[in-house]
Amino acid sequence: MLGGCSSDSGLMECAIRRFTLITVVAVSLWATATASASTLLIVGAGDGHGVGMSQDGALGYAEHGWSYGAILSHYYRGTAIGVAPEHTVVKVLMGSKVKGIALETYVRGVVSAEVSSSWPMAALEAQAVASRTYALTAHAGGSRFDVYPDTRSQMYLGKAAETPSTNAAVAATTGQIVTYGGKPAITYFYADSGGHTESVQYGFPGSSPQPWLVGVADPYDNGPLRKWSVSLSFSAARAKLNGLVKGSFKGIEVLKRGSSPRIVTADVLGSKGRTLVSGSELAARFGLYDTWAYFSVRDSHGTHPEPEVGAKKTSPPPAQPAQAISSAPVGAAGGSAAAPEGGSGAPTNVGGQGGVSAG
């Protein structure tokens, strides 16, 4: 006689109850084991925020014979080359103190820190002009200082890091900056576009659209992080998304993409609801190189793409020729897009660039 079953008439009913209980427990344990065995697969492209010039792309264009002016015109649409005001001093926050550095001296200490000195001269010259322009337009610290000496703005390592080739690129472009409508145009840059750059309003949500910072195809960007992938167990994914998952983790649903198409917004799916997140927060939580990413789930039944409601991809604007150099100094910075400060949520910056890219 089964314990708790006091009569023959109740024996069958009791056995059924126990069988049902055992079945429920077994199914629950199986479901838990299945969830823990599921894997979140992430396939992505690029390294950085994707807005403006890709350093690996500039390298590729230079290797294909493009001039620095053509490279800059490709990434910063409708721009021209102008001349910076004379005797410009860049205010750099060094520790707790602000140091004033002459513009050309500052740029020499940046270019050698941002890209490899072995790159073709056109790529180094494009970097020099972009970095010089960024120094004039960033205003990271308001009126107190202009730039940080690191990836929050752009890398600056000073005279000790200078090289003959990068100094030659700075000298060859002395005073030259990127302008739009006769004013300095903020020149964001980063390591690798993944094959397409991003429009500023999608790369930095909350920023106003700018006509020179639009997404363009980038076929000559062939850096080491043009394509990458990551896999995480569901338990590891949930741990990284701590505070965002309601109930048990079920996956990611992308709601909106930019033109590249980097993620603008997505939902973290849980058994008890969903949580809206930005693409940059999602990249930061997972430690991704870029917000250009696609998600799928692999389990015992196979691999399943995550549900997605994506923005339509837009065709890139037509290529534009390099603009002529103007000899007159230009005035205040154009546009209204402030330089976003701090990290981008990936191992790169949101200001200028996130360190030297391999190539």
What are these language model-derived features?
Residues 2-359:
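Conserved, single-site charged/polar hotspot
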